[in-house]
Amino acid sequence: MDSPFVLVNLKTYQEGMGSNAHRIAAAAETVAKESGAVIGIAPAFTELHPMSHHYAIPVYAQHIDAITPGAHTGHILPEAVRSAGARGTLINHSERRLTLADIGACVESARRLHLETVVCTNNDATSAAAAALRPDYVAIEPPELIGSGVSVSKADPGIIERSVNAVRAVNPDVNVLTGAGIQSGECVKIAVDLGTCGVLLASSVVKADDPEAVLRDLVSLL
């Protein structure tokens, strides 16, 4: 990816639902146009269709299940995510962990449907294992720093560098994102300087009084 990538996970925060989700999406669209950065969002599943059709930004599902069409009540069907207009999906977020077999099956299903894949990992070893599955992105997020307000870029830059090297050693075509506590342009710049193509983040944007201002700051040093 040539342009830096900022992916905002709205999770199930109240601040990321309904009209609030639209406010964040509109802010992402505005800042992306101004900066040239690619800013995507991962909204709740019920928001995938409106977000995908109303805004000129990439929209990702927060999860898919390793299933095919059939009797799977309550599961997230990859085909349904694609039909809703999503560009891609998160897989194996620390709040929705999967087995390695299911991660692989999800990546294969997404590839068949031309959905981009962002496989989340928690250290350099799991990053290397994920890279072997040939996703589009591996996103390294130390779970202890997620939502902590302490940036991985400052608290543990070594894990970013090790993960980038581990992924490149397995498959240099896989892009690397990092996340956990990302909250400023300085955090993003450090991550990019260490070899990532961008960041995955949530609360610093979703819970902000002014998401547009935060997004503008996040890309300000790129």
Swiss-Prot record:
What EC number(s) would the UniProt record show? 5.3.1.1
Q: Name one GO molecular function term.
A: triose-phosphate isomerase activity
Cytoplasm as UniProt keyword: yes
Question: Which of this chain's residues are annotated to bind substrate?
Answer: 9-11, 146, 181, 202-203
Q: Which reaction does it catalyse?
A: D-glyceraldehyde 3-phosphate = dihydroxyacetone phosphate
Query: Where is it found, in Gene Ontology cellular component terms?
Result: cytoplasm
Pathway recorded for this protein = Carbohydrate biosynthesis; gluconeogenesis; Carbohydrate degradation; glycolysis; D-glyceraldehyde 3-phosphate from glycerone phosphate: step 1/1
Q: Could you list this entry's UniProt keywords, alphabetically sorted.
A: Cytoplasm, Gluconeogenesis, Glycolysis, Isomerase
The annotated active site, in chain numbering, is 93, 141
Q: What class of enzyme is it?
A: isomerase
PROSITE patterns annotated for this entry?
TIM_2
Localization per Swiss-Prot or TrEMBL: Cytoplasm
UniProt GO BP: gluconeogenesis; glycolytic process
Matching entries from Gene3D superfamilies are given as: Aldolase class I
Which family is this protein grouped under?
Belongs to the triosephosphate isomerase family.
Alphabetical list of NCBIfam families matching this protein: PRK04302.1 (NF003302), tim (TIGR00419)
How does the annotation summarize its subunit structure?
Homotetramer; dimer of dimers.
Functionally, this protein is described as follows:
Involved in the gluconeogenesis. Catalyzes stereospecifically the conversion of dihydroxyacetone phosphate (DHAP) to D-glyceraldehyde-3-phosphate (G3P).
Query: Do you know which HAMAP family this protein is assigned to?
Result: TIM_A
Q: What is this protein called?
A: Triosephosphate isomerase
Q: Which gene encodes it?
A: tpiA
